[in-house]
Regions:
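Conserved N-terminal beta1-alpha1 strand-loop-helix module at the mouth
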Residues: 1-182
Length: 183
């Protein structure tokens, strides 16, 4: 689960990631998160789906839930195609995509781009804040580990961001407070 703050309102948004089966879609349709993520064509993840599989899964998704494609060093053409054909509402770049990749992608689509950053030290957050992506995602690193990073490193952030990694019932309240103190 990921928590996101959006500078346009004071509400907390929820994103559930790693959907790959029809049962997952039925569960998120019932839970009604704001976003759901699909790890696309990243074979080293057991949660990975193909482009064709994500197209089929999204057909069953509640239209109020925005589908996010999670890409790790994917060819730009794959990202563009799934954004342009309406399969995805947002792209999350979770690999080594640099600023030139993000800027070029943004010239081809008006869909929103999320760039994930692994946070180990305060300077990692400063680097994230310089990103031209529409949203930044602050994570412990690697994705899907269930671990948090040191949230005390997060300053007041005046732009939309996702907080990811290890968010559960024991720390959800703290995650929400971090978002309220920022945006």
């Amino acid at each position: 689960m990921q928590k996101m703050t959006d500078g346009n309102d004071s509400g907390t948004k929820i994103k559930i990631c790693g959907l790959r089966r029809r049962e997952d879609i039925l569960a998120v349709n019932e839970a009604k998160p704001d976003y759901c993520g699909f790890i696309i064509e990243f074979p080293s993840s057991f949660r990975s789906v193909t482009a064709d599989e994500v197209r089929e899964l999204v057909k069953e998704l509640d239209p109020e839930i925005r589908p996010v494609g999670v890409f790790v060093n994917a060819p730009m053409e794959l990202v563009r195609t799934l954004l342009d054909d309406g399969t995805l509402a947002l792209a999350q770049l979770h690999g080594q995509e640099d600023e030139s990749y993000i800027r070029e992608l943004k010239t081809y689509t008006d869909k929103l781009i999320i760039k994930a950053f692994s946070i180990k030290i305060a300077e990692d957050i400063e680097k994230a804040l310089q990103s031209s992506a529409d949203y930044i995602l602050l994570d412990q690193g690697g994705g899907g580990t269930g671990k948090t990073f040191d949230w005390s490193l997060i300053p007041e952030i005046q732009r939309p961001f996702f907080l990811a990694g290890g968010i559960g019932t024991s720390n959800l309240g703290q995650a929400i407070q971090i978002g309220r103190a920022s945006c």
